[in-house]
C-alpha cells in the first residue's frame, strides 16, 4: 500500500515541501534562517492575536490599553515583550537570510529572490505600522516623520500625506488604519512566503559551493528537520533570554511617555533595524533625494542578479569579493550606529561617507572585482 503522505492531496504538498524534498547534502547553518523566519512569523501572528484581544486602536485609550495588558492581563507583559522582541529577532534572521543569499549567489534564482525582496518590504511596512500602535512619543513622532516623507513627491505629495493620515495630522484615523494594516499584513506575508517557497522548490536549494548538486541530494527529513529544530531551539532561547532578562534593551525610553503632539522628543529615531536606512535618508540634505536614497537602499537588492559578473556563483572561492562583502556588512553596521546618533559633526560626515560607500560597493566595486577575479582565473 502506498504511504498516505504520498497520495493524499494535502499531505502530498507537505510531503514534497518538508519530508521527501531532495536537498543538497552540504548546506550549512546559514540555510537555517528560512525556517527560523517561518517560526518568527508564526510567533508574531500568535502573540499579536492575543495582544489584539486586549488592545484598543483609539488615541485616548491605546497607551492605557498597553499598560493594562502589561499590568492586568495574565502574562500580558510576556506576550507584549515576546511580540516586541520577536520583531527584533525577525529582522536579525531576515538580514542574515539576505546576507546568505548575497554571499552564496542565491539571487540567481531570480523569482525566489524578487519575491524575497517584496517580502522584506512588506515585513518592514508591518513593523513600521506596528511601532505606531502603542501611541507613545516615539510612535507618534516616528509616524509623523516617516509618513511626511511622502510630501516630497512632486505635485501630489501633500494630498497623498493627508490621504494616508485621514486628516491634517497623525490622529485617531491614522491609528485605526495602521492597526488594520498591522493586522492584515502578516497574513499577506504568510501568502507571499508560500509563493517564495513555491519558486524555491521549482529550482531546488543552492549550496555553499554554488554548483549543481543534483547528483548528491538527501531527503529533507530527518536530516534537515532535526537541524532546523536545533536552530529553532537556539532562536527561542535567545528570544526568551532577551524577553525575560532585558525586555527594554532594544526599545526607546521615549515610548513610555504618552504621545503628545505639542512636545517633540530631542532625538526622533526608528527601531534599531531601520537605523541603517534612516542614516542613508538623513545623509542627503535634499528631501526628495533622501527619500529616493532610502527607497533605493532596499530596492537595490532587485538589481543584484543583473550586477553579477562573476563566472562563479558563490563567493566561497573568491577572496576579493569576500573582502568587499564583509566591508559591506561593516558599512551597514556603521550606518546603523550613525542612524541612532544626533545630527551633528562628525556623525553627518561619517553618515554621508558610509552611504556613498554602500552604493559604491554594490553598484561598482563588487561587479568590477568579480570581473578582475575572472581575469585572474583566466576565465
Curated annotation (Swiss-Prot):
Q: Which residues form the signal peptide?
A: none
Q: Which residues bind heme b b562?
A: 83, 182
Pfam families for the chain: Cytochrom_B_C, Cytochrome_B
The record's listing under SUPFAM superfamilies reads: a domain/subunit of cytochrome bc1 complex (Ubiquinol-cytochrome c reductase), Transmembrane di-heme cytochromes
Q: Where in the cell is it found?
A: Mitochondrion inner membrane
Q: Which UniProt keywords apply?
A: Electron transport, Heme, Iron, Membrane, Metal-binding, Mitochondrion, Mitochondrion inner membrane, Respiratory chain, Transmembrane, Transmembrane helix, Transport, Ubiquinone
Keyword presence, Oxidoreductase: no
Residue ranges crossing the lipid bilayer per the database entry: 33-53, 77-98, 113-133, 178-198, 226-246, 288-308, 320-340, 347-367
Cofactor comment: Binds 2 heme b groups non-covalently.
Q: Which PANTHER family match?
A: CYTOCHROME B
Q: Can you name this protein?
A: Cytochrome b
Amino acid at each position: 500500500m502506498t504511504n498516505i503522505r504520498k497520495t493524499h492531496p494535502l499531505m502530498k504538498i507537505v510531503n514534497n515541501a518538508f519530508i521527501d524534498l531532495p536537498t543538497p547534502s552540504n548546506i550549512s547553518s546559514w540555510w537555517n534562517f528560512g525556517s527560523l523566519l517561518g517560526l518568527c512569523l508564526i510567533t508574531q501572528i500568535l502573540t499579536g492575536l492575543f495582544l489584539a484581544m486586549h488592545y484598543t486602536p483609539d488615541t485616548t485609550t491605546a497607551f492605557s490599553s498597553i499598560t493594562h495588558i502589561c499590568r492586568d492581563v495574565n502574562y500580558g507583559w510576556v506576550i507584549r515583550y515576546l511580540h516586541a522582541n520577536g520583531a527584533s529577532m525577525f529582522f536579525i534572521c531576515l538580514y542574515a537570510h539576505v546576507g546568505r543569499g548575497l554571499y552564496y549567489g542565491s539571487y540567481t534564482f531570480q523569482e525566489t529572490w524578487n519575491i524575497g525582496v517584496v517580502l522584506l518590504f512588506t515585513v518592514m511596512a508591518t513593523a513600521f505600522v506596528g511601532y505606531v500602535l502603542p501611541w507613545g512619543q516615539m510612535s507618534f513622532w516616528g509616524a509623523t516623520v516617516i509618513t511626511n516623507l511622502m510630501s516630497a513627491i512632486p505635485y501630489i505629495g501633500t494630498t497623498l500625506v493627508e490621504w494616508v493620515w485621514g486628516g491634517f495630522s497623525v490622529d485617531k484615523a491614522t491609528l485605526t488604519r495602521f492597526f488594520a494594516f498591522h493586522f492584515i499584513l502578516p497574513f499577506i506575508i504568510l501568502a507571499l512566503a508560500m509563493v517564495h517557497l513555491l519558486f524555491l522548490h521549482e529550482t531546488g536549494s543552492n549550496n555553499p559551493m554554488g554548483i549543481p548538486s543534483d547528483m548528491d541530494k538527501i531527503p529533507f527529513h530527518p536530516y534537515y528537520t532535526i537541524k532546523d529544530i536545533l536552530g529553532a531551539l537556539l532562536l527561542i532561547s535567545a528570544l526568551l533570554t532577551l524577553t525575560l532578562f532585558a525586555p527594554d534593551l532594544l526599545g526607546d525610553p521615549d515610548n513610555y511617555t504618552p504621545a503628545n503632539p505639542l512636545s517633540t522628543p530631542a532625538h526622533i529615531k526608528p527601531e534599531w533595524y531601520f537605523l541603517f536606512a534612516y542614516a542613508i535618508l538623513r545623509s542627503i540634505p535634499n528631501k526628495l533625494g533622501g527619500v529616493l536614497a532610502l527607497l533605493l537602499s532596499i530596492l537595490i537588492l532587485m538589481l543584484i542578479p543583473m550586477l553579477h559578473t562573476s563566472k562563479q556563483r558563490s563567493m566561497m572561492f573568491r577572496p576579493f569579493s569576500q573582502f568587499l562583502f564583509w566591508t559591506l556588512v561593516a558599512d551597514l553596521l556603521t550606518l546603523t550606529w550613525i542612524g541612532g546618533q544626533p545630527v551633528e559633526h562628525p556623525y553627518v560626515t561619517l553618515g554621508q561617507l558610509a552611504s556613498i560607500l554602500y552604493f559604491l560597493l554594490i553598484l561598482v566595486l563588487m561587479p568590477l572585482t568579480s570581473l578582475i577575479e575572472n581575469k585572474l582565473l583566466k576565465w
